[in-house]
Design a protein with these regions (language model features):
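Extracytoplasmic beta-rich repeat domains
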Residues: 3-6, 17-35, 42-46, 57-74, ...
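Short loop/turn segments that connect beta-strands within beta-propeller blades
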Residues: 11-15, 51-54, 91-95, 132-135, ...
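Type III/flagellar secretion export determinants
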Residues: 40, 49, 89-91
Length: 186
C-alpha cells in the first residue's frame, strides 16, 4: 500500500505488475494474505478484502475513522485495529464481523500477535492489550507507565515465547510480561 491509496500486487517470480486496487486515502498498515484474500485497512475508514489473484473487491467493512493498523490473519480470521478505539476480528472470506472490541482509548497501528488463544496489540494510549481470540473479551491490559507517548507499546510489534510477551519500546528498553496475567516480569 502507499500514500496515494493504492494497493499494488507484483508477481513473485519476476516482479511484474499484476494489479492495483485504489482506495480513497492512504494505506499505512501492512496488509496480510491468506486463502486467496488480501486484507488491509485504509485511512478512508474501511477494511478491505481483495481477491489476491484478480485484485477485485470481495468485501469492505466500514469503520468510523481511519484504519491504520497492520493485519494478522489466522485460521481465516483477520485481526486489525482502527483509529476509533476499536479492534476487529473479521472472517476473510465473507467480510462478516466476528467481534469488535471497543475499549481502546488510543488509535492502533501495530501488527497484532496471536499467542496462546489471545490477540495481543499495542495502542497509542500507552497500553498493550490481550483479548480472547474467540470472543474479543479483554483479558488484561499492560500499562507501560511512561510519560511520553512515543515510548508506548503502540510503536512496537509484540513477540511471545514460553508464556511471556516481549515488547521493546523506542527507548530500547525491553519488558517481559506474563502472557496469562499481564503482570510485568522484568
Amino acid at each position: 500500500g502507499d500514500d496515494l491509496g493504492f494497493l499494488t500486487c507484483f508477481a513473485l517470480k519476476d516482479g511484474k505488475h499484476k494489479w492495483e486496487f485504489k482506495t480513497d486515502a492512504r494505506i499505512v498498515g501492512t496488509p496480510a494474505a491468506a486463502d486467496g484474500v488480501v486484507v488491509f485497512g485504509s485511512a478512508d475508514a474501511n477494511i478491505y478484502g481483495i481477491n489476491a489473484k484478480s485484485g477485485k473487491l470481495i468485501w469492505k467493512h466500514a469503520s468510523s475513522k481511519a484504519v491504520l493498523g497492520a493485519v494478522t490473519i489466522e485460521k481465516g480470521i483477520a485481526y486489525i485495529g482502527g483509529s476509533n478505539g476499536s479492534f476487529y476480528a473479521i472472517d476473510i472470506k465473507s467480510g462478516k464481523l466476528r467481534w469488535e472490541f471497543t475499549g481502546v482509548k488510543g488509535y492502533i497501528e501495530t501488527r497484532p500477535l496471536i499467542y496462546d488463544g489471545k490477540v495481543l496489540f499495542g495502542a497509542w494510549d500507552n497500553n498493550l492489550y490481550a483479548l480472547d481470540k474467540a470472543t474479543g473479551k479483554k483479558l488484561w491490559s499492560w500499562d507501560a507507565n511512561l510519560t511520553r507517548m512515543h515510548f508506548s507499546p503502540a510503536a512496537v510489534w509484540p513477540v511471545a515465547a514460553d508464556g511471556r510477551v516481549f515488547v521493546t519500546a523506542p527507548d530500547r528498553m525491553m519488558s517481559a510480561i506474563n502472557a496469562t496475567t499481564g503482570e510485568t516480569l522484568w
